[in-house]
């Protein structure tokens, strides 16, 4: 039998140190993993329509290079707002430690109503983030059972009921420490928070996150964008109409300089200098 001639690990060599804390980006931006921003995990579904529910892991649309499956209740752009703010608060301490805040302050940061309706909406979003499970892998390792991340976006949530007489009581959330894998040096994007909050259209918010992941966005077919956004528009014509309105909103906000949809139904956009400012903000 041939002998194993490989060298055993040297116990004196230090093991690679794994980061335990998220990057300390600037207060005016929010961090979002690129594979999530370039997928239909957070859809543009209408808040007046029932959310889909997937009992088994279902592969959702992403750009080439990644495979993302989801099980649980459909996540939408309001859930992305909550996730962005939660991750922002969590960056100040090691992952896995409790993240505490008042529901009042959280709602205020989101621009949501500080009312029973707002508290219930926030709690429902945390519930979805806790009970919806994702699996993310590269398209070269998806068949090997290796996942860059596997689990819920929120490990645990504790908060008082919306009708509590203590509106400024503490709510507490725990994140999975493994979520750090989604925030490597070139694996996440800084989203300009004030711009995002001013956008009232779910489609405009999605496009804002998506195009933030590219300094010079690649042209993309309207049909591809429809799939990535998770739009339920019955006809591509209807989606294209909404897309034009959303793109113009991004121009009005100073995020885009220009956009066109050419004769081949391909979307071309030009990021503005102001839109790229979030990329160069120092931490603090």
What is each stretch, according to the model?
Residues 1-284:
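Charged, alpha-helix-forming regions
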């Amino acid at each position: 039998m041939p002998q194993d001639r490989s060298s055993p690990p040297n116990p004196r060599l230090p093991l690679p140190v794994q980061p335990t804390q998220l990057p300390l980006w600037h207060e005016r931006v929010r961090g979002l993993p690129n594979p999530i921003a370039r997928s239909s995990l957070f859809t543009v579904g209408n808040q007046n329509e029932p959310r889909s529910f997937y009992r088994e892991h279902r592969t959702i649309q992403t750009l080439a290079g990644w495979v993302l499956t989801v099980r649980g209740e459909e996540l939408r752009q309001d859930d992305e707002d909550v996730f962005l703010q939660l991750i922002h608060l969590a960056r100040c301490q090691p992952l896995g430690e409790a993240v505490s805040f008042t529901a009042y302050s959280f709602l205020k940061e989101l621009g949501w109503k500080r009312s029973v309706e707002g508290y219930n909406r926030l709690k429902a979003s945390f519930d979805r983030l806790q009970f919806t499970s994702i699996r993310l892998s590269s398209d070269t390792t998806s068949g090997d059972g290796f996942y860059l991340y596997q689990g819920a976006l929120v490990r645990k949530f504790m908060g008082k009921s919306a009708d509590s007489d203590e509106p400024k009581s503490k709510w507490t959330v725990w994140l999975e420490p493994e979520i750090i894998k989604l925030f490597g040096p070139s694996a996440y994007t800084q989203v300009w928070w004030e711009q995002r909050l001013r956008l009232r259209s779910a489609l405009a918010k999605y496009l804002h996150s998506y195009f933030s992941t590219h300094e010079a966005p690649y042209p993309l077919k309207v049909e591809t964008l429809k799939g990535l956004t998770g739009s339920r528009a019955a006809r591509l014509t209807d989606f294209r109409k909404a897309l034009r309105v959303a793109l113009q909103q991004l121009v009005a906000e100073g995020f885009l300089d220009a956009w066109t949809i050419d004769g081949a139904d391909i979307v071309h956009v030009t990021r503005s200098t102001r839109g790229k400012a979030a990329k160069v903000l120092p931490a603090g």
